[in-house]
């Protein structure tokens, strides 16, 4: 017993190495990198954005809907109802006549007027003033309000008197100076109503 060697101390030089007991340490093989589940792909290049022809145009809101009803385009204004009303001529109806008389007022620079008389199927148009001359005229009597044709009568006027004086001055005597007094074209003309005998107008050859 005394000749036996002392037991080796754990961890001493005589202790067998862990490598000798279990062998050389095994080298771990490198593991491959995990394959990514999804790879991000960049979108293909489609070129520059499309050109906007109307840079100031704003697209309407898709959630807006115009109210139902008639559509009126911009810049259009419906005409007022007064534009479709036909003009009403000034007309009056005589109490004893069957037709209707329409009177148009005279113009601003003329002293003569216009009278249009319609009786059944007869239309009479009269211009007051110069139209009353040496012949009968169709008109409406201002007194009896009847459409009539005036009755004329010739009367000696100023022109007859002046022509008689002129004939005496040039030597026409023995009654020759009275010749202008028997010429109707030199006399004044009086227009009267054949119904009520009222004087309508007197046409004077010389005022």
UniProtKB/Swiss-Prot annotation:
Task: State the source organism's domain of life.
Answer: Eukaryota
Domain called LITAF: residue spans: 121-205
* Functional summary from the UniProt entry: May act as a p53/TP53-apoptotic effector.
Q: Where does Zn(2+) bind?
A: 141, 144, 193, 196
Q: Where is this region: Membrane-binding amphipathic helix?
A: 161-183
Instruction: Enumerate the GO terms in the molecular function aspect.
Output: zinc ion binding
Q: Name one GO cellular component term.
A: cytoplasmic side of late endosome membrane
Please give, as recorded in its UniProt entry, the membrane topology of this protein: Peripheral membrane protein
Stated name of the protein: Cell death-inducing p53-target protein 1
Q: Where is the composition biased (Pro residues)?
A: 1-13
Set out the biological process GO terms recorded for this chain's protein: intrinsic apoptotic signaling pathway in response to DNA damage by p53 class mediator
Note the InterPro entries from the entry.
LITAF, LITAF_fam
The residue ranges flagged as biased composition, category Basic and acidic residues, are 18-31
Upper classification of the source organism reads:
Eukaryota, Metazoa, Chordata, Craniata, Vertebrata
Keywords, alphabetical: Apoptosis, Endosome, Lysosome, Membrane, Metal-binding, Zinc
| Record remark on domains | The LITAF domain is stabilized by a bound zinc ion. The LITAF domain contains an amphipathic helix that mediates interaction with lipid membranes.
